[in-house]
Design a protein with these regions (language model features):
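Long, C-terminal-biased catalytic regions of enzyme "large/alpha" subunits
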Residues: 1-266
Length: 266
């Protein structure tokens, strides 16, 4: 079955950094437009590469069992409500690709999926998958003890980042995932995050969570993963910095330490 399907699940790391570099907050129209263009290019490239491999080595054994074999692409089956977020305008020639896929097939039965990418983001010094960072500085556990990681480009992009617990609602994040799902051929498991400090009496209303559930369904989410709640705790480290140490000084210290970081030398 593995050889017959040759399933792949390729996704993003560092989306928050990408949006920050382009000066786009998650809840902005600019972010939705950027993600639409990025993900169209991403999925088109994956399908093109798999199609070319099929021309050379033949399609996967179970290609005939996929929707692709009938010329059906993700852009044919997405929830059309996503068009409320971004106009369905495309840069690439999907009809030509569709014809090539019907004629030659694909080497892989699936291609795109979104993973948490917790480990790979550490090695790459990238933000986790498609998630907004919880803060500029995070402390992650490793075999050698706590690992300090700052968001990429902190010194010049810090004001551009969307921080998870600063978001007033999940709307922007929900929309970003919905736009991605339009092109992905496997379900994306998104997360919902709530900061009680943004609500009266520090209590998240059930109506807000219900609305998020209905909105994700409306825009074509297939599954959800975590419901995160801000508990006012911060990352803990064995030797916390002294009260006089501000984040800028800590960042400078970390950047110096990275010169001898084994992960950065990979």
């Amino acid at each position: 079955s593995t050889l017959n399907r040759r399933s792949l699940g390729i996704g993003y790391i560092g989306l928050a950094h990408y949006l920050a570099k382009n000066g786009a907050k998650y809840d902005s129209q600019k972010a939705h437009d950027l993600v639409h263009k990025l993900t169209e290019r991403f999925q088109f490239a994956l399908l093109t590469a798999s199609n070319r491999m099929a021309m050379e080595k033949g399609p996967c054994g179970y290609f005939g069992k996929t929707k692709y074999a009938d010329g059906i692409l993700p852009i044919d089956t997405y929830k059309k409500e996503v068009d409320e977020l971004v106009e369905p305008q495309y840069k690439y020639d999907w009809d030509s690709l569709r014809d090539d896929i019907k004629q030659y097939g694909l080497r892989h039965s699936t291609l795109s999926a979104q993973m948490p990418s917790e480990s790979s983001s550490v090695v790459s010094n990238a933000t986790n998958g498609i998630e907004p960072p919880r803060g500029y500085l995070s402390i992650k556990k490793s075999k050698k003890g706590p690992l300090k990681q700052i968001v990429p480009g902190y010194q010049h992009l810090k004001n551009n980042y969307t921080l998870l617990w600063d978001m007033q609602s999940n709307k922007g994040y929900i929309n970003v995932v919905a736009v991605m799902q339009k092109f992905f051929d496997q379900a994306i498991s998104g997360n919902w995050s709530y900061n009680p400090e943004h609500y009266p009496d520090n209590e998240v209303p059930v109506s807000v969570m219900a609305q998020d559930f209905l909105t994700t369904y409306k825009y074509g989410w297939k599954t959800s993963y975590y419901q995160n709640t801000y508990d006012i705790k911060t990352d803990e480290i064995e030797e916390p910095p002294t009260p006089s140490t501000d984040l800028g000084e800590l960042v400078s210290c970390i950047l110096t330490e990275e010169e001898d970081c084994e992960s950065c030398k990979i």
